[in-house]
Amino acid sequence: MKKTNKESKSYLAKLLATENITVEHRKVPTAFFDLQKRLLVVPIWKQEMSNDVLDLLLSHEIGHALFTPMKEWKKAVDIDKIPHSFLNVIEDARIEKLVKRKYAGLRQTFIRGYRDLIEKDFFKTKDRDINDMLLIDRLNMHFKSSYIESDIDFTSAELDIVDRMKNLETFEDVKKLAKELSEYCSCLLYTSDAADD
């Protein structure tokens, strides 16, 4: 990526975040936002990413900057012992909805960016049947694929979870659903293991 493009995208990220966050470009597998340091890291990949993907990654991480409460996140993981992966997938769905609501012009950016990532097999799903994946992974792909276009199968009980994820508004909602979902999935695994014995 050209230096001027990096700089302009970094300034855009700061504007969207409505604060003077630090933006760094590093050789990392994916973008992330450090809630405590207020640091947004953008990956540098061997194969140059499209503007749609870059804008998607920035917009997604800006969602965390704007809407993910640091103290509550830390408490949810460290004290409430909610599995990080469940919390993250569910929080991602919430913050993406909220950032698209705040910046309506980003809706198509998310759709085009995720289409590009899915097409390039970023999520390693090309040679897999998504419907055979764990529920948390199917939920993640459902929301990443702009659930309007998703053809992922869910049971009626799972569709209730999908609907709840669509309607998340607060981080408290996220914590509650993540805890319930991790317990539900643990119960399914336990039941499946018992049936195999």
Which residue ranges define each predicted feature?
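A short, hydrophobic C-terminal helix/tail in secreted or cell-surface proteins
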Residues: 193-197
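Short, functionally important secondary-structure microenvironments
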Residues: 1-192
